Design a protein with these regions (language model features):
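Bacterial N-terminal signal peptides
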Residues: 8-17
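Core alpha/beta catalytic barrel or barrel-like domain that forms the active/cofactor pocket
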Residues: 190-211, 233-251, 274
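Short, solvent-exposed turn/loop segments enriched in Gly/Ser/Thr/Pro and often Arg
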Residues: 165-169, 180, 235-243, 768
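Sec/Tat signal peptide C-region and signal peptidase I cleavage site
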Residues: 18-22
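Intrinsic-disorder/low-complexity accessory segments
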Residues: 23-133, 137-161, 207-208, 213-215, ...
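Divalent-metal coordination cores built from histidine and acidic residues
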Residues: 158-163, 168-207
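Bacterial N-terminal signal peptides that target proteins for export
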Residues: 1-9
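Substrate-binding cleft of carbohydrate-active enzyme catalytic domains
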Residues: 171-174, 194-198, 212-227
């Protein structure tokens, strides 16, 4: 009896302590001046950061982490929220989650013991897409609720779960909230903004999580895949499909064939908890499966990259805004179905309802993790160990193409059934040539090794284990030099390794057999190793050698080359290396003369057309050697001056942008800055003002800049975005007025034409290649067919459809525009523009730079009717007066991923 009283007393004291702690936690209204969810009220990031720090100071349930800088220099924060006892022991629980997540080095028995000891780790973020304002505000409210509530469910969650509340986009919240709250009249407040809500990527910041180009992506990936390895990742978004409140899991097919099945089953389990809670709380409007467009196929999203790391990724897309709105009538959403089990009726809607729904969903996820703590942790280990085992033996992933081959083998077996010797399954799924790879080797002697190092860093920043060769070695009969990288698939994150190197094999996902395709959510294929032009070898047997394991998360630098002794005639370096352009720009910025070698250096058999040459001088040597060492660029010394040479000089580069921002322009800005190209943003009003040649040598128009000509005047492709020169300036601050407007056929195109005729260079991508039709360049849309009645029409989607995929094209390396490029390269292609030349094209000096020479150019993804692409041209150079126009049908700057194509941009950026 006495012991019971003591225990009861301890529990009572603990509850009193928790209650006192909760009373000390500042409420959002005390800090912000309004309740989270109040109409017409948004918090800025400055206010949110201060509140997070107050929670950290006031509550022993909260620990704040500074996870790194944003692109605009703010600090990005994450809160760990759990019971006070767990907070005191966070490092131990982090170690348990890391160890189970990586799976190697422990036995099954040890894993079970760790799962029994550990705490489930759940990541919840908000604000990635800053105009989706529910996300940041549910994060604030969730932090407050977890730090202050003392109900039984909350205390059980805090005892069993470590909740990581991560802000995903500090800069975006500051921009959006400040813009919204600037208007004094609440009823006139709007979330429209003058520029992208992430400095470079805008909405595409949720497409960067296998490349990790952006600082915020790097910060988040480090926490997810190196520091914590949570079991659940919940990524909040907007907006829900019309006629619903929120879309969430389970998601529609297809899912990637490399996932562990426990990922998908675990996703279904969490999804059931989410839907169940909303329905039990009489909150209708949750849609799932085919009720929304979302799938689990794509890698690169904050949520989806988690699947490739054995993490259950949750996405919800919810309606709501600080400005009151409504749920409109969508009749076919009113009938209950498995996709929409509890429909919602049309009604008015306010911000508070969205916050309430979000809190319910968060608690559903956390309650699931709390109740299944042991299984969440052990399954993380089991999935990782499954990957280790699959990568350590012969294994055949069941890809759609392999199943198609199996069906063909069955048909062959039936036609020769009398032999009785056919075993189609064994023929396909035990074929040694079809085995999954066990090892990828990235040799250090490839032409552009610094770009290969960038690729390796993308792997490392996603938690992949990489080895480096400390000396020369041999594998599968081939010699490799020291410094080569070895990536084995016998590791927990094997799905991500395969996805970065191997083609994506998207199924023929049709509405019905022979019917139109169902568009993938985002891309169908993206293989980064292909897009970046990486040379690698794929081995189906394990490799041992003089290898050193790179510590998790330790990014690599290109090896500093050995610099030659002083040279009498100067120095050369390769045009095949992307980083060479960084070196060139460093030299030019210091006033040092740089030349290109149209025929290479005849005294160097390894030299190629377009290589760079710098004359000898003390200053040139100092700048060149410093920059080359920083960027991993090899330098050759010359004893005799090369000939012929062509001098290049810095150009005045203009990059089109618009009010509200352009993601394609933003990514191009990112690339220019990464490679030290100075530039100026140019907006439509400046173009319309004319006299462009006075200020600029080169103008870049990415997709969305140039409108299509009037219907019937050309074969223009793509919608463009333009044609309306004016725009209402009401509500737009004066400092942004110069950004307003659009490119028009009447005002803008004549000025661009004049710029070209006076010797300017224009580079266009995707829909902006419409400019060619405005200028009467003799090209046509190649993606048309002639019917029996002689009528020319576009292909239907059942005949031809290539969503985002990787296709191989030939490159005309004889042209200056393609100096440094290989004879073939991989393009990211998304129903992109494809051309054919008119009769007079050659006589007018129009040249093809890239084209499809085969009827099967698909390398990764999905391509219905790809045979129609044969002989289609996707990159063109055309003279216009004294200037040059470049047309790139695909986006060769796409999300700063296709490093293998960057030279097609860089070569044009000098005068």
């Amino acid at each position: 009896m006495k012991n019971r009283l003591i225990v009861s007393g301890i529990i009572l004291l603990s509850l009193v302590a928790m209650s006192l702690s909760a009373q000390q936690v500042p409420t959002p209204k005390e800090h912000f001046g309004f309740n989270i969810g109040d109409d017409y009220q948004l918090a800025t990031y400055t206010q949110t950061e201060a509140y997070f720090k107050k929670l950290d100071a006031a509550s022993d349930r909260v620990k704040i982490y500074d996870i790194g800088p944003s692109e605009e220099g703010r600090r990005q924060y994450m809160l760990a929220v759990s019971s006070p006892a767990n907070i005191r022991n966070l490092e131990r629980y982090k170690t348990i989650s890391q160890t189970l997540g990586r799976a190697q080095g422990i036995t099954d028995q040890e894993a079970r013991a760790m799962a029994d000891e550990g705490k489930a780790v759940v990541w919840i973020d908000g604000g990635l897409h800053a105009t989706e304002t529910v996300g940041t505000h549910q994060l604030i409210e969730t932090a407050y609720q977890l730090a202050s509530r003392t109900d039984k469910e909350t205390l059980e969650i805090l005892d069993n779960v470590i909740v990581l509340l991560a802000h995903a986009n500090p800069d975006g919240q500051e921009l959006v909230s400040s813009s919204y709250m600037r208007e004094e009249d609440p009823t006139k407040r709007r979330t429209s903004i003058p520029r992208l809500y992430q400095k470079y990527a805008g909405h595409d910041n949720n497409r960067d999580f296998f490349m990790n180009n952006l600082k915020e992506s790097q910060n988040i990936s480090r926490q997810l895949y190196i520091e914590w390895i949570p079991q659940i990742l919940y990524n909040h978004h907007q907006s829900g499909p019309a006629g619903t409140v929120v879309a969430g899991p389970p998601f529609r097919d297809p899912f990637r064939h490399v996932y562990d099945p426990l990922v998908i089953i675990g996703l279904d389990g969490v999804a059931a908890s989410m839907a169940n809670r909303l329905i039990a709380e009489n909150k209708p409007g949750y849609t799932q499966k085919g009720g929304s467009q979302y799938s689990t196929w794509y890698n690169g999203g904050l949520r989806t990259t988690g699947y490739y790391h054995n993490i259950i990724g949750i996405l919800t897309e919810i309606i709501g805004s600080p400005t009151p709105s409504s749920i409109r009538l969508v009749p076919n959403r009113l009938v209950p179905s498995s996709s929409n089990p509890f429909p919602i009726e049309p009604q008015s809607w306010n911000f508070q309802k969205s916050i309430d729904y979000s809190l319910s969903l968060n608690y559903a996820v956390l309650d699931y993790a709390s109740r299944n703590r042991y299984h969440m942790l052990y399954n993380l280990y089991r999935m990782g160990m499954n990957s280790v085992e699959r990568g350590s033996k012969d294994f055949w992933t069941k890809y759609p193409k392999a199943v198609d081959a199996l069906i063909e083998a069955q048909e062959r077996g039936r036609s020769s059934a009398e032999t009785g010797s056919s075993n189609p399954f064994e023929e396909i799924f035990r074929d040694p040539e079809r085995r999954d790879p066990r090892v990828f080797i990235v040799p250090s002697d490839q032409d552009d090794f610094p770009t290969a190092v960038r690729f390796i860093n993308a792997l490392i920043s996603s938690g992949i284990q990489v080895h480096i060769a400390t000396s020369d070695f041999t594998a599968a009969g081939k010699n490799y030099p020291a410094g080569s990288y070895i990536v084995k698939t016998s590791q927990a994150f094997r799905p991500h390794v395969l996805d970065m190197f191997e083609p994506q094999d998207h199924p023929n996902d049709l509405q019905y057999p022979g019917g139109p395709p169902i568009a993938p959510y985002d891309a169908a294929g993206w293989t980064p190793a292909f897009q970046m032009g990486i040379s690698f070898d794929r081995l189906t047997e394990d490799v041992t050698g003089p290898f050193s394991v790179i510590p998790y998360g330790e990014l690599q630098s290109p090896p500093a080359p050995t610099m030659p002794a002083n040279a009498r005639a100067g120095y050369t370096f390769s045009a095949k290396v992307n980083n060479s352009f960084k070196v060139v720009n460093d030299l030019l910025s210091e006033g040092i003369r740089v030349f290109r070698l149209p025929q290479g250096d005849r005294n160097n058999p390894l030299s190629n057309p377009g290589d760079f040459y710098v004359q000898a001088s003390a200053k040139a040597r100092t700048v060149l050697f410093r920059s080359a060492a920083e960027n991993g660029v090899n330098v050759n010394a010359l004893t005799a001056a090369p000939s012929p040479t062509e001098r290049i000089q810095p150009a005045r580069i203009a990059l089109w942008d618009r009010y509200g921002g352009s993601m394609q322009s933003g990514w191009t800005r990112f690339i220019l800055e990464q490679f030290n190209f100075p530039y100026t943003l140019i907006f439509p009003q400046r173009i319309d003002a004319g006299n462009l040649r006075k200020d600029f040598d080169i103008i870049i128009f990415v997709s969305g800049a140039i409108p299509a000509p009037p219907r019937g005047e050309s074969g223009a492709q793509g919608p463009g975005r333009g044609g309306s020169g004016g725009q209402n300036l009401d509500g737009i601050p004066a400092e942004y007025h110069h950004m307003v407007g659009s490119i028009t056929t009447e005002e803008s195109v004549p000025q661009i034409k004049r710029f070209l005729e006076e010797g300017g260079v224009v580079i266009t991508m995707e829909s902006s290649t419409n400019l060619a039709y405005h200028l009467d360049i003799p090209i046509e849309n190649a993606m048309v067919k002639t019917d029996e009645d002689g009528r020319v029409r576009n292909f239907t989607r059942t005949e031809y459809y290539v969503p985002g995929s990787v296709l191989k094209a030939d490159i005309n390396t004889n042209e200056k525009a393609a100096w440094g490029m290989p004879s073939a390269a991989d393009f990211y292609f998304s129903n992109s523009n494809v051309f054919r030349f008119g009769e007079d094209a050659s006589q007018m000096g129009v040249k093809k730079l890239a084209w499809f020479s085969t009827a099967e150019p698909l390398r990764s993804g999905w391509a219905l009717g790809q045979e129609f692409l044969k002989d289609g041209i996707i990159a063109v150079e055309a003279p216009v007066g004294q200037g040059k126009l470049y047309l790139f049908g695909p986006n060769i700057a796409f999300r700063s991923q296709p490093h293998g194509l960057f030279k097609l941009i860089f070569n044009q950026l000098y005068k």
